[in-house]
């Protein structure tokens, strides 16, 4: 990946969890990534979405923040697992009015952009 690309351009070219980890120079164990790649990327996305309003305008600072959040997302799955972390809505359970539990995900949430 060329260093002349803007952060946004570089992010568009990244495809896999390994691409992101390599680009941001986050050391990783391929065995951890192999099992948790989608969870790591979703957690990274979730962290960035929460941080977005507070990002500094300077791209170099943004790159550093992105790297920290990606490293944290990866570490979440080094020290835990996907069932414990419940990154995706299908793994999250909510209480039902009858006292039971449900992991139902409505279509409006599935197709939300």
Swiss-Prot record:
The keyword rRNA-binding belongs to this UniProt entry's keyword annotation: no
Keywords: Nitrogen fixation
Alphabetized InterPro entries for the sequence: NifW
Pfam families for this protein: NifW
BP GO terms, sorted: nitrogen fixation
HAMAP family in the record: NifW (MF_00529)
Role played: May protect the nitrogenase Fe-Mo protein from oxidative damage.
Subunit structure: Homotrimer; associates with NifD.
Family: Belongs to the NifW family.
The protein, known as: Nitrogenase-stabilizing/protective protein NifW
Origin species: Dechloromonas aromatica (strain RCB)
